[in-house]
Amino acid sequence: MQKLAELYRGKAKTVYTTENPDLLVLEFRNDTSALDGQRIEQFDRKGMVNNKFNHFIMAKLEEAGIPTQMESLLSDTEVLVKKLEMIPVECVIRNRAAGSLVKRLGIEEGLELNPPLFDLFLKNDAMHDPMVNESYCKTFGWATEAQLARMKELSYLANDVLSKLFDDAGLILVDFKLEFGLFNGEVVLGDEFSPDGSRLWDKKTLNKMDKDRYRQSLGGLIEAYEEVAHRIGVKLD
Protein backbone atom coordinates (compact mmCIF):
# COMPACT_ATOMS: atom_id res chain seq x y z
CA MET A 1 0.00 0.00 0.00
CA GLN A 2 1.56 3.30 -1.13
CA LYS A 3 1.33 6.37 1.08
CA LEU A 4 0.28 9.51 -0.76
CA ALA A 5 -0.31 12.93 0.81
CA GLU A 6 0.49 13.93 4.38
CA LEU A 7 -2.84 14.26 6.16
CA TYR A 8 -1.74 15.18 9.67
CA ARG A 9 1.51 15.61 11.58
CA GLY A 10 1.32 15.10 15.32
CA LYS A 11 3.97 15.33 18.03
CA ALA A 12 5.46 11.88 17.31
CA LYS A 13 3.52 10.43 14.35
CA THR A 14 2.62 11.44 10.80
CA VAL A 15 -0.55 10.25 9.04
CA TYR A 16 -0.69 9.75 5.26
CA THR A 17 -3.53 9.03 2.87
CA THR A 18 -3.47 6.02 0.54
CA GLU A 19 -5.27 5.11 -2.68
CA ASN A 20 -7.93 3.48 -0.49
CA PRO A 21 -10.09 6.18 1.17
CA ASP A 22 -10.74 3.86 4.15
CA LEU A 23 -7.06 3.22 4.91
CA LEU A 24 -4.19 5.38 6.17
CA VAL A 25 -0.47 4.94 6.78
CA LEU A 26 0.69 5.78 10.29
CA GLU A 27 4.40 6.67 10.50
CA PHE A 28 6.15 6.66 13.87
CA ARG A 29 8.93 9.25 14.06
CA ASN A 30 11.89 9.49 16.45
CA ASP A 31 10.44 12.62 18.05
CA THR A 32 9.74 12.64 21.78
CA SER A 33 7.77 15.45 23.37
CA ALA A 34 6.81 16.74 26.78
CA LEU A 35 4.89 19.73 28.13
CA ASP A 36 2.20 19.43 25.42
CA GLY A 37 4.79 19.56 22.66
CA GLN A 38 6.81 22.51 24.02
CA ARG A 39 9.86 20.28 24.54
CA ILE A 40 10.82 17.96 21.67
CA GLU A 41 13.92 15.81 21.09
CA GLN A 42 14.82 12.99 18.71
CA PHE A 43 15.99 9.55 19.87
CA ASP A 44 17.42 6.96 17.48
CA ARG A 45 15.27 3.83 17.06
CA LYS A 46 12.29 5.30 18.92
CA GLY A 47 9.99 5.32 15.90
CA MET A 48 10.81 1.70 15.15
CA VAL A 49 10.42 0.58 18.77
CA ASN A 50 7.06 2.29 19.26
CA ASN A 51 5.72 1.10 15.90
CA LYS A 52 6.50 -2.55 16.57
CA PHE A 53 5.44 -2.24 20.22
CA ASN A 54 2.10 -0.77 19.18
CA HIS A 55 1.52 -3.40 16.48
CA PHE A 56 2.21 -6.16 19.03
CA ILE A 57 -0.16 -4.68 21.64
CA MET A 58 -2.94 -4.05 19.15
CA ALA A 59 -2.73 -7.68 18.01
CA LYS A 60 -3.09 -8.83 21.64
CA LEU A 61 -6.12 -6.59 22.11
CA GLU A 62 -7.71 -7.83 18.87
CA GLU A 63 -7.26 -11.40 20.13
CA ALA A 64 -9.18 -10.38 23.26
CA GLY A 65 -12.11 -9.10 21.20
CA ILE A 66 -11.28 -5.39 21.17
CA PRO A 67 -11.77 -3.87 17.69
CA THR A 68 -8.73 -1.82 16.64
CA GLN A 69 -7.76 0.23 13.61
CA MET A 70 -4.72 -1.98 12.95
CA GLU A 71 -4.47 -3.61 9.50
CA SER A 72 -0.82 -4.59 8.94
CA LEU A 73 2.81 -3.78 9.65
CA LEU A 74 4.30 -2.09 6.57
CA SER A 75 7.87 -1.31 7.64
CA ASP A 76 10.01 -0.66 10.71
CA THR A 77 8.27 2.67 11.25
CA GLU A 78 4.95 2.36 9.40
CA VAL A 79 1.63 0.55 9.81
CA LEU A 80 -1.52 0.43 7.71
CA VAL A 81 -4.62 1.40 9.68
CA LYS A 82 -8.32 2.01 9.17
CA LYS A 83 -9.33 5.64 8.77
CA LEU A 84 -11.39 6.48 11.84
CA GLU A 85 -13.58 9.43 12.65
CA MET A 86 -11.74 10.21 15.87
CA ILE A 87 -13.59 11.00 19.08
CA PRO A 88 -11.76 14.04 20.58
CA VAL A 89 -11.54 12.57 24.08
CA GLU A 90 -8.79 10.49 25.70
CA CYS A 91 -9.71 7.64 28.03
CA VAL A 92 -7.29 7.08 30.92
CA ILE A 93 -7.22 4.03 33.18
CA ARG A 94 -5.30 4.37 36.45
CA ASN A 95 -4.23 1.31 38.43
CA ARG A 96 -1.86 3.28 40.65
CA ALA A 97 -1.56 6.94 41.51
CA ALA A 98 0.92 8.87 39.34
CA GLY A 99 1.27 12.00 37.25
CA SER A 100 -1.55 14.55 37.31
CA LEU A 101 -3.62 12.52 39.78
CA VAL A 102 -0.91 12.86 42.44
CA LYS A 103 -0.66 16.62 41.84
CA ARG A 104 -4.43 17.13 41.77
CA LEU A 105 -5.29 15.18 44.93
CA GLY A 106 -2.02 15.35 46.86
CA ILE A 107 -1.85 11.59 47.26
CA GLU A 108 1.19 9.34 47.39
CA GLU A 109 2.70 8.22 44.09
CA GLY A 110 2.26 4.48 43.64
CA LEU A 111 -0.90 4.18 45.76
CA GLU A 112 -2.89 1.19 44.48
CA LEU A 113 -6.30 2.18 43.14
CA ASN A 114 -8.97 -0.48 43.57
CA PRO A 115 -11.11 -0.43 41.55
CA PRO A 116 -9.02 1.30 38.87
CA LEU A 117 -10.02 4.86 38.01
CA PHE A 118 -11.43 5.86 34.62
CA ASP A 119 -10.81 9.47 33.52
CA LEU A 120 -11.72 11.47 30.42
CA PHE A 121 -9.66 14.31 28.96
CA LEU A 122 -10.43 16.58 26.02
CA LYS A 123 -7.74 16.33 23.35
CA ASN A 124 -6.55 19.93 23.17
CA ASP A 125 -2.86 20.77 23.61
CA ALA A 126 -3.54 24.52 23.72
CA MET A 127 -5.79 23.95 26.73
CA HIS A 128 -3.43 21.31 28.20
CA ASP A 129 -5.95 18.46 27.70
CA PRO A 130 -8.48 19.51 30.37
CA MET A 131 -10.22 16.84 32.39
CA VAL A 132 -13.90 16.44 31.46
CA ASN A 133 -16.72 14.04 32.29
CA GLU A 134 -19.45 12.17 30.44
CA SER A 135 -21.90 15.06 30.85
CA TYR A 136 -19.50 17.43 29.04
CA CYS A 137 -19.01 14.90 26.24
CA LYS A 138 -22.75 14.59 25.64
CA THR A 139 -23.52 18.31 25.97
CA PHE A 140 -20.78 19.41 23.57
CA GLY A 141 -21.39 16.57 21.14
CA TRP A 142 -17.99 14.91 21.48
CA ALA A 143 -19.53 11.47 22.07
CA THR A 144 -22.94 9.92 22.68
CA GLU A 145 -23.94 8.06 25.82
CA ALA A 146 -23.71 4.73 23.97
CA GLN A 147 -20.27 5.57 22.58
CA LEU A 148 -19.01 6.60 26.01
CA ALA A 149 -20.28 3.37 27.55
CA ARG A 150 -18.52 1.35 24.87
CA MET A 151 -15.27 3.32 25.27
CA LYS A 152 -15.35 2.69 29.02
CA GLU A 153 -16.11 -1.02 28.54
CA LEU A 154 -13.25 -1.46 26.05
CA SER A 155 -10.83 0.54 28.22
CA TYR A 156 -11.43 -1.72 31.22
CA LEU A 157 -11.17 -4.83 29.03
CA ALA A 158 -7.85 -3.56 27.67
CA ASN A 159 -6.71 -3.00 31.25
CA ASP A 160 -7.51 -6.61 32.17
CA VAL A 161 -5.58 -7.94 29.17
CA LEU A 162 -2.57 -5.65 29.43
CA SER A 163 -2.20 -5.69 33.23
CA LYS A 164 -1.72 -9.47 33.04
CA LEU A 165 0.62 -9.21 30.03
CA PHE A 166 2.89 -6.74 31.82
CA ASP A 167 2.59 -8.45 35.22
CA ASP A 168 3.79 -11.71 33.66
CA ALA A 169 6.80 -9.74 32.37
CA GLY A 170 7.69 -8.34 35.80
CA LEU A 171 6.13 -4.94 35.13
CA ILE A 172 3.36 -2.85 36.70
CA LEU A 173 0.91 -1.15 34.36
CA VAL A 174 0.47 2.04 36.38
CA ASP A 175 -1.79 3.91 33.96
CA PHE A 176 -2.40 4.41 30.25
CA LYS A 177 -4.42 6.41 27.76
CA LEU A 178 -6.51 5.17 24.86
CA GLU A 179 -8.13 7.00 21.98
CA PHE A 180 -11.16 5.77 20.08
CA GLY A 181 -12.84 6.58 16.80
CA LEU A 182 -15.71 5.42 14.64
CA PHE A 183 -15.44 3.08 11.65
CA ASN A 184 -18.74 2.37 9.92
CA GLY A 185 -20.46 3.53 13.09
CA GLU A 186 -18.56 1.13 15.38
CA VAL A 187 -16.37 2.32 18.26
CA VAL A 188 -12.83 1.21 17.40
CA LEU A 189 -9.53 1.63 19.27
CA GLY A 190 -7.23 4.01 17.41
CA ASP A 191 -3.99 5.96 17.81
CA GLU A 192 -1.39 3.84 19.66
CA PHE A 193 -0.39 1.99 22.79
CA SER A 194 3.29 2.42 23.69
CA PRO A 195 5.47 3.60 26.60
CA ASP A 196 4.79 7.12 25.29
CA GLY A 197 1.18 6.96 26.47
CA SER A 198 1.42 4.65 29.47
CA ARG A 199 3.32 4.33 32.72
CA LEU A 200 5.20 1.09 33.31
CA TRP A 201 7.27 0.34 36.41
CA ASP A 202 9.56 -2.56 37.17
CA LYS A 203 7.84 -4.72 39.81
CA LYS A 204 10.95 -5.25 41.94
CA THR A 205 12.71 -1.89 41.73
CA LEU A 206 9.78 0.39 40.79
CA ASN A 207 12.09 1.91 38.17
CA LYS A 208 10.15 3.91 35.59
CA MET A 209 10.26 2.30 32.14
CA ASP A 210 8.20 4.83 30.17
CA LYS A 211 8.18 8.44 28.94
CA ASP A 212 8.53 9.71 32.51
CA ARG A 213 12.23 8.99 31.97
CA TYR A 214 12.16 11.87 29.47
CA ARG A 215 9.70 14.08 31.34
CA GLN A 216 11.78 13.80 34.53
CA SER A 217 15.20 13.81 32.79
CA LEU A 218 16.11 10.37 34.15
CA GLY A 219 17.94 9.29 30.98
CA GLY A 220 17.95 5.87 29.33
CA LEU A 221 14.65 6.38 27.51
CA ILE A 222 15.14 4.08 24.53
CA GLU A 223 16.94 1.48 26.63
CA ALA A 224 13.88 1.33 28.91
CA TYR A 225 11.46 1.08 25.96
CA GLU A 226 13.52 -1.72 24.43
CA GLU A 227 13.71 -3.57 27.75
CA VAL A 228 9.92 -3.47 28.11
CA ALA A 229 9.49 -4.63 24.51
CA HIS A 230 11.93 -7.50 25.06
CA ARG A 231 10.19 -8.63 28.27
CA ILE A 232 6.74 -8.89 26.68
CA GLY A 233 8.01 -10.57 23.52
CA VAL A 234 8.10 -7.82 20.88
CA LYS A 235 10.54 -8.69 18.09
CA LEU A 236 12.42 -5.46 17.35
CA ASP A 237 15.19 -6.65 14.98
Swiss-Prot record:
InterPro entries: SAICAR_synt/ADE2_N (IPR028923), SAICAR_synt_PurC (IPR033934), SAICAR_synth (IPR001636), SAICAR_synthetase (IPR050089), SAICAR_synthetase_CS (IPR018236). The keyword Ligase applies. It holds the Pfam family SAICAR_synt. Pathway: Purine metabolism; IMP biosynthesis via de novo pathway; 5-amino-1-(5-phospho-D-ribosyl)imidazole-4-carboxamide from 5-amino-1-(5-phospho-D-ribosyl)imidazole-4-carboxylate: step 1/2. It comes from the Bacteria. NCBIfam families: purC (TIGR00081). HAMAP family: SAICAR_synth. This is Phosphoribosylaminoimidazole-succinocarboxamide synthase.
